[in-house]
Structures are given as structure tokens and as C-alpha cells.
Amino acid sequence: SPFDTRLRLGRSQTRKESIIYFQLDFSEGIDRQALFHILSFISETKNTEVIFGAFSASQEQMEEVESLVNEIIKTQIDTDSLEKGIDYGRAENPLEENGEKELRFQFVNMNDDLDLIKTLEFVRLIVDLNKQPHLYTQIAGISAGIPQINQVETVYVEHLKNGYLISDVTEFSKAAHYYLDMLKEWNQALVYSIDKIKEHTGQRFLDKLHQWIEEVTDVKG
């Protein structure tokens, strides 16, 4: 089976915030418009965060994308709208120890599949708008029951089944709302992922997956 049994289904339902994983691919270059649309979505949608993830990128490449993101925020998005909500009842000082407010995005440079598994643990939505979607990210997404947004059709992601196929980055917000606003659509993607795994795995693993789907369904009702 190509699917990874180390990933646990439905973990994101245990978190209040919806975490989006955005796949970076420096071989294709960085799409500024795509970065803008996802940052804009995060700034306008409460309880959302984004992880910009890359595989084995150089320090220069990571600095480049961080600089570009900061530039987009500075020129096109209100920085305050990207701040994490602060629980004043628990924190005497609303600022972080370094004096900076915590923002709802982060950068992760991963070395192997174990890093990706750790990164995806509580992710609610995967976004890969590259011309060649990252194969292992797609497989990992199915293994964890996470719906995916792509611009290119692949054998792993089917439109409105376990993902959303957009023709242009301007459609990102519509696709993201489809899976983040309503639990029904997200659960359907989770069930579809189980069926996808069923095609490639034995009964023992399948029983374990059904146990997981029952648990996460009970949690959310």
C-alpha cells in the first residue's frame, strides 16, 4: 500500500483553530499571488492558521519566501489581522517574551517524511497549487484524511470528493471555505479517504480506520 499507517485520521477535529498546510516548491518558483490569496484568507477568517512547508530547502530559499510573505503583509494586508487571539485571563502580558505579537503563520523546512507526518498532525486542509503537486504530500493527506486543494488533477485527489480542484488562485477562498466552514463536507472527504485506503490495504488496517472515524464523529457529533 502507498498509504502511510503512521498518520492518524481526523486529528484536526481536536483543535479549535483550522490549520492550513501550504506546500512550497522552490523548483517551480514562488507564486506571489498564491501567497497573497492565502494570507488574505487567513487575515479575514478567524481561528485559521497557515503553515508554509518546504522539503530540504536552503536557508536562502526559506529567507526568500519569508521576506516575500512579510512584504505582502506589509504592503497589502493589515498585520494586526494576522495576530493570534490572546487570552488576557491567562496572560498578564499580551506580548510574547521577545516583545513581538504572535502571528497566525509559520514556516517549516522538513527533511523527511517523519517531519511531514509531525507537521500534518493537526492540519485541517492541504493546499498545493504547484504544477506538479508533491506526491508524498498527497498520499500523506489521504492517509490522514485531510482534504486537499490543487490546481492540477491527479489520481489521488478527486474534485469535491477528497479535495477541491481550482482553475485559478483567485478561487482559493471559495475552495477553502467549502471545507472549513461546514463539517459535513470535511467529514465526507474523511470517509472518502478511508474508501481510498480500503482499495489498497487489508482488513486489519481498515478496521482500525473505522474505529478512528467513529471516534472523531462522536467528538464533533
Regions found by a protein language model. Give the residues of each.
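Acidic, amphipathic alpha-helical patches
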Residues: 113-116, 137-138, 162, 172, ...
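A charged, aromatic-enriched C-terminal amphipathic alpha-helix characteristic of glycosyltransferases
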Residues: 170, 181-214
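Conserved catalytic-core segment of nucleotide-activated headgroup transferases in glycan assembly
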Residues: 3-104
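Acidic donor-binding loop of glycosyltransferase active sites
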Residues: 118-133, 146
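Short acidic alpha-helix that forms the nucleotide-activated donor recognition element
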Residues: 93, 112-123, 143
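Short hydrophobic beta-strand element within catalytic cores of glycosyltransferases
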Residues: 145-151
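Short alpha-helical segment that forms part of, or immediately flanks, the ligand-binding pocket
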Residues: 117, 135-143, 154
